[in-house]
Amino acid sequence: MMFKQYLQVTKPGIIFGNLISVIGGFLLASKGSIDYPLFIYTLVGVSLVVASGCVFNNFIDRDIDRKMERTKNRVLVKGLISPGVSLVYATLLGIAGFMLLWFGANPLACWLGVMGFVVYVGIYSLYMKRHSVYGTLIGSLSGAAPPVIGYCAVTGDFDSGAAILLAIFSLWQMPHSYAIAIFRLKDYQAANIPVLPVVKGISVAKNHITLYIIAFAVATLMLTLGGYAGYKYLVVAAAVSVWWLGMALRGYKVEDDKVWARKLFGFSIIAITALSIMMSVDFMVPNSQSLLTYVW
């Protein structure tokens, strides 16, 4: 029973979703030549770092989680794990994850993990989520870290391919998160969390969703235009982007925003999974200039 509680507090669904993107970035960079020990070290390392961040987030959010229907039964809210124990647990997970990335992958992968962790726990969870409508934007950077870590674990440098991945996954986070905020609007209002639909209204949020999906569509094309992914990837990227944009535009005519937002959220998961799969299997050898090389 205790194992289940310690697993739940790490948010395994979030870990699994991040692993899909890590695999996408790793295999894109590997280009068919897979270093399996490196692959395992990277997956486990990122999983532990994400788990650590989620436990810290649960610790920080336990007061507002009590006010939200979706989160009122979380482990820390119900007192099934003490706050002190959760902090020790989160710290140990983080140390293990960062050590695996440093020694099993490379220092750059580790530092990217540290940056993503600091943004999520230190900037987003501790401050921005509760105080700023821009919290979602800042949080999107940490959400985009895993595929970049996977990519840089292979390459050892931050090149234009890594930058494109950062853009794709950051831009994807925005409509994905705003959709959640719309169909969970009452929860966010009850907890006084200043997400865009609460502060500016659902109509403004719909405009932002549409614009971010357009930007996401452009970013996805850059992997092919930059010589990193092939035309099969391009076709899938274009198809999911057009469909997702169409769903967003239909939101201006719907009567039930909650139902629409839930569908938009559901398709966002399909879209990013499809892209992660396609970049894993339809890769190309790029001609690129390194933006940041870590020599060790």
Swiss-Prot record:
The residue ranges for the Periplasmic side of the membrane come to: 29-37, 98-107, 217-228, 288-296
GO biological process terms on file: heme O biosynthetic process
The cellular location(s) given in this protein's UniProt record come to: Cell inner membrane
Among InterPro entries, the record links this protein to: Protohaem_IX_farnesylTrfase (IPR006369), UbiA_prenyltransferase (IPR000537), UbiA_prenylTrfase_CS (IPR030470), UbiA_sf (IPR044878)
Named from the GO MF annotations, one term is: protoheme IX farnesyltransferase activity
Q: Of which family is this protein a member? A: Belongs to the UbiA prenyltransferase family. Protoheme IX farnesyltransferase subfamily.
- NCBIfam families assigned to the protein according to its UniProt record, in alphabetical order: cyoE_ctaB (TIGR01473), PRK04375.1-1 (NF003348)
What function does the entry list? Converts heme B (protoheme IX) to heme O by substitution of the vinyl group on carbon 2 of heme B porphyrin ring with a hydroxyethyl farnesyl side group.
This one is known as Protoheme IX farnesyltransferase
- Primary gene name: cyoE
